[in-house]
Amino acid sequence: MKGSFTSSETRFIQQATLEYLKVRNNWTTQNADGEVVDRIIILLTDGAKKDNWSKDITTRMNRKTNQEESYQGLEQVLNDMELPCPVETISIPDGKSEEEMWTIFNVVYEALRINDELYFDLTHSFRYLPMLVLVLGNYAKFLKNVTVKHISYGNYEARDANTNEAPLMDILPLTMLQDWTFAAADLIQNGNIKKLQELKENNALVPLLRERGKKNIDRRLAEGYLDAYIDSLRNFLNDMKLCQGPNILSGVTINQIRDCHEQVSEAFEKVIAPIPPIISKIQKSLKDFETTDTMYPESLRNGYEAAKWCYDHQLYQQAVTILDENITTDFCQRLGTDEHVYKERTASNALLRWGVYREEDWEADTLEAVREKVQVAACSPDILNFIRLMQKDAVWIHNGCRNKYNHASMIQGTEGMLTPEDIEKLGRIIMRIVGRIR
C-alpha cells in the first residue's frame, strides 16, 4: 500500500513493488537495436533460493501451525505476472562477514550497466544493506553514471491489523537529500555549481516534495524559488570566473543571492525542513561580501573579498586579476580620478607604483583640472599612507604575478616562471589587505 495505490494480495513485496512501478506498462524488453533495455534482478542467497524462489516449490511448512500448506515461490509469481522484461537472478553469500559484505557489493556493482536507472527494494535484506545501497548508489553514479530512481521498503511490521495491508515506504527522498548535501558541499568547498544545476534541471526535488505530500502551490513556489536561488549562485560564480569587475563591485549578484535566499528558506520551511539548513550553509560561505563598512565602500570591499574567494577556491589567475584591478580602483577613488577612463586609470596606477607624481605619466590631452587635482591629492596624508601600505604589494602583484599568469611565464623580463611559492605569497598579500579592511 502506497498512497492511493494498493497492490494485489500477495506475500511478496517484489510483486507489490513491480505493480507500484507499473512495470507491465512502462518497461520494455529490447530497444530498436535489439539490446536488452530493462531487467529485473533478484539477489538470492542459497537459503532464499531454496525456500522462497524456485517455481518448483508448491508447499511449505507453516511455522505457526506446524502444518504443511500450499505455497508458490517468487519465480512462479513473477512468471504469472507476464512481465515485459527478463527476470535475472544473481547468487550472493549470506553476508555474515566483512568479506561477504564486499562480495555482495562487487556482485551488485558488476551487474550494473553504464547509464542504468536503478530501482531498489530493500525489504528482505541484511541489516547493513540500506547503507550498502546508499554507498553503492553514489559509487555507481560516479563510475557508471547511473541514476537511482527508486528505493522502497515494505514495512510489514506496520501493517493494518484489520486488513493486513502493509505500507510500501519510499526512502528515495533520503538519498535525494544526500545528493543535495553533497552538491552544496561541492559548491562551498570547490566553487563548483554543476551538481546543483544538474539536480535542478533533473527536477531532483520532486521525490522529496511528493513524499512530503504538501499542497501543489507550496511545491511550485518552493521549486521556483530554489531555481532562482541556484541561478543567482551561478551568476555569482560566473562573475568570479570571468572577472566581471562591475558586477562584483556593484554587488548586484550578491544582492540577488541574498533576496533569493530569504524567499527559498521561507518556502522550504513549509515543505521540506531539512533543505533550509543546507541553503543557510551556502549563504554563510558568502557572508564576507555583506558589509556596511564606512571606510571602504561596499563595492571596494566586495572586490577584495572576491579576490580572497577566488584564491580560496584555487582560481588564482582570477584572484590576482581582480586584486590588481581593485587596488587600482581603490586608489583612483581616493585620488579623485575616474577609474572608468583608461588614461586616468593608467596614470593613477603609475602614481601608485612609482610613489611620486610624474608629469610624463599624464598625457598632454588629459584634462588640466584632473592633473592639478592629482598633483594636490598626491601629497595628501591619505594618499601617501595608501602608497606606503600598498606600493610594494601592488608592484609585485602586477609585475611579479599577474604578468606571469597572463603571459604563461613566456615573456622575458618577468623574473622567471610562476612558482607555488608565488601563489603562497599572493595568498599572504590578500589576507593582509583583507585583514585591514574587515
Task: Kindly label every feature range from the protein language model.
Residues 1-117, 138-438:
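Long, low-complexity, Lys/Arg-enriched
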Residues 119-135, 400:
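Elongated alpha-helical scaffolds
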